[in-house]
Regions:
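Bacterial N-terminal signal peptides that target proteins for export
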Residues: 1-8
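Structural motif
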Residues: 33-38, 67-70, 98-99, 139-142, ...
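Bacterial N-terminal signal peptides
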Residues: 8-18
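A short, well-structured beta->alpha microelement
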Residues: 44-53, 373-394, 401-404
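Active-site-adjacent "subsite" loops/lids of carbohydrate-active enzymes
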Residues: 25-50, 79-134, 140, 144-149, ...
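Boundary at the C-terminal end of the N-terminal hydrophobic targeting segment
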Residues: 19-23
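Hydrophobic targeting/anchoring helices
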Residues: 62, 106-110, 126, 134, ...
Length: 622
């Protein structure tokens, strides 16, 4: 009898456990982060019940991170255990979280990691958290901006970057990881890296050593409003996941989005969620509990382009009353409903997409120069795949000023070109590493500038663009795309895309405007030629204006997304052998039109697609 009961139990578990593992979404997990301020309030059962009802009636969540400390508020043991028990009763997985700030409102005031009292408190918080959880995550602020007298003295003759990299790596191991594991040997300590990766080294985030000492990493994919403090481009929400996946393969837990940018429109918030998942993040964490239950729906989030009626996210449908599983009518009240609808819609697509592929771009650890440039390139339709090491086996790769300090820079380029492949470097890299690169081609980029708006046969820009002048020897290298003011009938012209022959390969220089945002002003035909040159490893490239991005996958699928406020007509360009594209969500087929390529270029197939504002479409091709 006992044997039969055991087998029956095992059979039941075999059925139930996969369903539990699957959660509320088919292709990823959705979690939520609760700040210490809100976790502390969870001691009040009424507050906990009422706020959870607001969220859970509109949004399906699989997991919650309960923060134990922020701004010197340490949540008591009893409150943490009560919250854990409450969410377990709802079928929600729990983990811990720590924000190491002294006063977030005071310019994100951080701990001073040479201060003995601060160090003791940092350790005590880690031990307190490990007591309650088998996993906890460090929110954005495990860095230091402290410049108190003691910290200045401790730095000595080192640069701030050198000192902080060493200090925060030491603090991570000795104050957080080791003490936590001594309290709870099962605990996994995860570090969440924020979205400002190109500035990490200056505040102590060590992307070389950090991912090796922590049990895992997480990725900040918040891009919010590009006009606000960090000026991050939409594409970063995708690009940073890919970069961190390449930093720590198999150990990047997911992406992290907050409500920032929703003031622009519902679509700006939706894009951050959507792009995070397009990068194939296994989980997304929503910051935060107080926003999801407290930020009410606002009519101003309904952008004017919603009147077109065929955008990817329909505001009116998303906020309309709906029936829950029990047949009750739910009237949406907060941003939580937008989150749920966008993620479920994205979930329907994700299972059809393979692994992301893109144009390889090397970024050296702790490098400076042309910060965040790859995100601007992503916004002009160049699919980016950033790597912490040099790409191998590629027909072409991109090097920016972030490669300037590599002592092997010229030899790596030489190797690539000798194998009959190509390299694209930016004007910023030529300026930063002019002497090294002169062994490849004697180009100069100094402080000379040019104002351009006429790209000749490649069109005109609507605004003047300030570019660095790339100087070269006549007949040693050649302009592929040129610009002047004017160029046709003008007096001067300057390279936008430049080409030099070297061994069996092509060495290209891409001119980057002083203001990276003016890449968006490059005419469509100029962008098409840049994409053609840089997309040699890819099956598809774009013929489109700027602010249209392309996402490619290794199973011959793609997503193309319009970030403009107006509709665009674009072409997906392929070699002639690709005949048909099929819409992954609507099963509509489009046929390619064979057209002549550029000067001395073979014919190509053009697949016409019309994209409404802030809208994506997905296709398979063969």
């Amino acid at each position: 009898m006992k044997t039969r009961k055991l087998f029956a139990l095992l059979a039941a578990l075999a059925f139930v456990l996969p369903a539990m593992a699957q959660g509320n979404y088919k292709n990823f997990k959705v979690s939520m982060y609760a700040r210490a301020y809100e976790v502390d309030k969870m001691a009040d059962q009424h507050w906990l019940d009422s706020t959870w009802t607001i969220i859970s009636s509109q949004l399906k969540v699989d997991k919650i991170y309960l923060e134990t400390h922020r701004d010197l508020l340490i949540v008591p043991d009893a409150t943490l255990e009560k919250a854990k028990k409450f969410f377990a009763s709802k079928g929600i997985e729990t983990a811990g979280g720590i924000t190491y700030t002294i006063n977030e409102a005071n310019n994100f005031e951080t701990f001073c990691y040479s201060n003995p009292e601060h160090r003791a408190l940092v350790q005590r918080i880690a031990e307190h958290t490990a007591k309650h959880f088998n996993e906890f995550i460090l929110d954005d602020f495990f860095f230091t901006s402290c410049k108190e007298d003691g910290e200045i003295d401790a730095k000595g003759s080192k640069s701030w970057t050198e000192y902080r990299l060493e200090k925060m790596t030491e603090a991570g191991k000795n104050l957080v990881i080791d003490p936590a594991k001594k309290v709870n040997p099962k605990v996994k300590v995860i570090i969440k890296y924020p979205n400002w990766y190109d500035h990490f080294q200056g505040l102590g985030f060590n992307l070389d050593k950090g991912p090796k000492i922590f049990d895992g990493i997480w990725t900040g994919t918040e891009t919010r409003d590009p006009g606000s403090a960090q000026h991050l481009q939409n594409y970063l929400s995708y690009n940073i996941i890919r970069y961190f996946n390449n930093l720590a393969p198999g150990r990047n837990g997911g992406g992290w989005v907050d409500a920032g940018g929703i003031n622009m429109s519902m679509d700006r918030y939706a894009e951050q969620l959507h792009l995070t998942m397009l990068a194939k993040a296994p989980e997304i964490s929503l910051f935060a509990y107080h926003q999801l239950c407290g930020i009410g729906l606002q009519s101003s989030w309904r952008a004017p382009w919603q009147d077109l009626g065929n955008t990817s996210w329909n505001y009116d449908k998303i906020v309309a009353p709906f029936k829950d599983a029990k047949g009750n009518t739910i009237t949406p009240s907060t941003m939580a409903v937008i989150t749920d609808r966008v993620l479920h819609q994205t979930d329907e697509l994700m299972g059809k997409l393979g692994n992301p592929v893109g144009i390889n771009s090397f970024k050296a650890f702790h490098s400076r120069g042309e910060a965040f440039l790859q995100n601007y390139l992503g916004m002009i339709g160049l699919p980016m795949e950033m790597l912490p090491s040099y790409p191998t086996g590629k027909k072409v790769f991109l090097l920016t000023a972030q490669a300037a300090n590599d002592p092997d820079l010229a030899s790596k380029i030489d190797q690539q070109l000798r194998t009959g492949n190509d390299v694209v470097v930016t004007s910023g890299l030529v300026k930063a590493a002019q002497d090294k690169l002169s062994t490849i081609c004697e180009l100069q980029v100094n402080d000379l500038k040019a104002m351009v708006n006429d790209f000749g046969r490649h069109g005109k820009s609507e605004r003047d663009i300030l570019i660095p002048q790339v100087l070269y020897y006549t007949n040693d290298s050649w302009e592929v795309v040129s610009a002047g003011r004017p160029l046709n009938g003008g007096t001067s012209g300057y390279p936008i895309l430049h080409r030099a022959l070297y061994s069996k390969g092509n060495y290209y220089v891409l001119t980057i405007p002083d203001d990276f945002g003016q890449l968006y002003d490059y005419p469509r035909a100029a962008l098409k030629e840049i994409r053609r040159v840089m997309s040699q490893d890819l099956d598809v490239y774009l013929d489109a204006p700027s602010k249209v991005s392309l996402f490619l996958y290794d199973n011959k699928t793609l997503v193309v997304e319009n970030f403009n406020d107006t509709p665009v007509e674009i072409n997906l360009v392929t070699e002639p052998g690709i005949k048909t594209m099929t819409n992954l969500l609507e099963n509509e087929k489009i046929q390619g039109e064979l057209q002549a390529g550029g000067w001395r270029q073979p014919k190509e197939n053009f697949f016409k697609v019309i994209l409404p504002p802030h809208t994506y479409k997905a296709y398979s091709y063969k």
